[in-house]
């Protein structure tokens, strides 16, 4: 078995091939409640792995994340209302949204937009805010053999990711093998959402059915899915990565 290490997104160097032997755990916070985020942090703490968190809002848990030298913070701006805009809404501009998040996470070097919204103009603006790594490109592991990061024209680095829990749900990939996925060649960036980890989401329908209780810790926990779901897959993955770091 090839020895594998977990690393953060900002540790990727396109000029060096070390990223091929690493696994990158990333998390889209998506306005999750603190008890949901804390659950993901607790699971990660069992194995002392590296991770990158794409932040949507301020929370006291940022202090805990910053205190761990193996964690880093990126930003997760939501530009959807700029695209699907309602004329009656008072909508913030792209720069206002970036200002807001960079005030919360001034050290952020990476970005993954909500819904992976991206454009050449957005890349120019990201660069203005000292963002060096764009993670807005997904190439699903089951549609290609090998992917790699690449340098963009503005000297930013594009970091495609090849596993996302919500895309797995959309494709209904219930029986996917985390050992096989984690052993594939090329860049291995995984994207999870704490809300799906907490719920152990097994389908989009299950997630949608529980939306109204996502802020109710007791009810949300009571509705955690018993059969194999996102939480189970995540635990399988981090156990695999941890075993390879020994």
Functional labels for PLM-detected ranges:
Residues 1-70, 99, 103-107, 119-132, ...:
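Terminal accessory/targeting
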Residues 19-29, 75-92, 221-222:
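Glycine-rich phosphate-binding "P-loop"
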Residues 30, 112-113:
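A generic secondary-structure micro-motif detector
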Residues 79-107, 113, 169-173:
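Ligand-binding grooves and catalytic loops that recognize ribose/phosphate and carbohydrate rings
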